[in-house]
Swiss-Prot record, chain B:
This is B9 domain-containing protein 1. Its main location: cytoplasm. GO terms for cellular component: centrosome; ciliary basal body; ciliary transition zone; cytoplasm; MKS complex. GO terms for biological process: cilium assembly; smoothened signaling pathway. Belongs to the B9D family. It comes from Xenopus tropicalis (Western clawed frog). Component of the tectonic-like complex, a complex localized at the transition zone of primary cilia and acting as a barrier that prevents diffusion of transmembrane proteins between the cilia and plasma membranes. Required for ciliogenesis and sonic hedgehog/SHH signaling. Keywords: Cell projection, Cilium biogenesis/degradation, Cytoplasm, Cytoskeleton. Part of the tectonic-like complex (also named B9 complex). Residues 8-126 form the C2 B9-type domain.
Length: 192, 198
């Protein structure tokens, strides 16, 4: 019946590479002390990964929600990667910021998550944390606001330098991401 | 040469069921679709405008539209997967129609029946002076094109207030997505963690 099962049409730009689509939304955040929030996000991949289309970083709108238990961003994400290997599977890193009534921004939390490797639609919750600082800094933060921030965002998604940090839990980010895979079966890679 | 399919089809039917806006009444909605360059609608209706609905008398205070959606897209590439953009309007104290919410969600990716609750938001004035003039003139800020809520770029300058939500149900049929080598998984939420609703 299927004489053409092994002669599928592949797009000419990436005839032999496996492809990953990541499509969905950063829905919003809950569990933070204040809910006038926005989010900076980015996707980090290994060297074998090539972005074919889409953007891999951005910033959401600032939501001042009517009812104060969740901020909604409904921020769309749409990325198309080609890859030669599984190393460096995409990681999404997030920074949640609070904007006060004067328009000042302060860091509320960092977080990262691996993009799920199972194809399909995933509802995800990503818990966040922020650096605590010394006790002098904490007292200063009580009165002035602000607080310590990381100098380099690689600490968010890397594990090698984390042991220097003391952190405290903050709220969580809600996401819905759909992963579509192509040509993985061709190489015997089992993702589901 | 045995020629396999070169495009896949995404057929979506469904309805904009209802909305929850505790503060507002007599609302109607508009819908449209935003999709990437590789996508094209092959049949169906690309945009629509619903009737004006009032809240039910009972305790639930539901705003029911029961408004049909039917559309078929074709594409060669999932990038730019279509999103439905919904905007809700209703009369203010002077009887002028003002926007009560914008929202967008991607059409579901897997065959079957899916329900989506879309959180809605309205843009806010960026300065106190604008806030005062908009209050004084009785005109609140709107997006000139509601389709911007389906775009990710340039949103860092936008201030919004989220209020209310809209419930939409979809029936999805796909054709030749697998034959083109795409694996979208199956089932709606294979490893779902519960999403807390507002």
């Amino acid at each position: 019946m299927n004489s053409h099962t092994h002669e599928l049409h592949y797009s000419p730009t990436c005839a032999v590479m496996a492809e990953v689509h990541i499509i969905g939304q950063i829905i919003g955040a809950s569990g933070f002390p204040q809910h006038s929030l926005f989010c900076k996000w980015g996707v980090h991949t290994g060297g074998a990964w090539k972005l074919l289309s889409g953007v891999v970083e951005g910033q959401t709108q600032v939501d001042h929600p009517q009812n104060d238990d969740m901020a909604f961003w409904s921020h769309p994400i749409d990325m198309h990667f080609a890859t030669k290997g599984l190393q460096g599977w995409p990681k999404l890193h997030l920074q949640v910021w609070h904007q006060d009534t004067f328009g000042r921004n302060e860091l509320y939390g960092y977080s990262f998550l691996h993009i799920p490797s199972t194809p399909g639609t995933h509802s995800l919750l990503s818990p966040t944390w922020r650096p605590l600082g010394t006790w002098q800094e904490q007292i200063c933060q009580m009165f002035v606001g602000g607080g310590p921030q990381l100098k380099s965002s690689s600490l968010i998604y890397g594990g090698s330098d984390r042991y220097r940090l003391q952190t405290v839990a903050m709220g969580q980010v809600h996401l819905q991401l759909t992963v579509i895979l192509r040509n993985f079966e061709r190489y015997g890679v089992e993702c589901s | 040469m045995a020629s396999g399919p070169s495009v896949f089809l995404l057929n979506v039917s469904g309805q904009i069921e209802s909305a929850e806006f505790p503060e507002f009444d007599d609302l109607y909605c508009k819908y449209s679709f935003v999709y990437g360059h590789d996508w094209a609608p092959t049949s169906g209706v690309e945009e629509g405008i619903s009737q004006i609905t009032s809240k039910s008398q009972g305790g639930k205070q539901a705003l029911v539209w029961n408004f049909p959606i039917e559309i078929t897209f074709k594409s060669t590439n999932p990038f730019g997967w279509p999103q439905i953009v919904i905007s809700v309007y209703g009369p203010d104290a002077f009887g002028n129609d003002v926007v009560r919410g914008y929202g967008a969600v991607h059409l579901p990716f897997t065959p079957g029946r899916h329900a989506r609750t879309i959180p809605m938001f309205v843009p806010e004035s960026s300065s106190r002076l604008q806030r005062f003039t908009s209050w004084f003139m009785g005109r609140r800020p709107e997006f000139t094109d509601p389709k911007v809520v389906a775009q990710g770029e340039g949103r860092e300058v936008t201030r919004v207030r989220s209020q209310g939500c809209v419930t939409v149900s979809f029936n999805v049929v796909t054709k030749d997505l697998k034959k083109l080598g795409y694996n979208t998984g199956s089932g709606d939420f294979p490893n779902a963690t519960t999403m807390s609703q507002p």
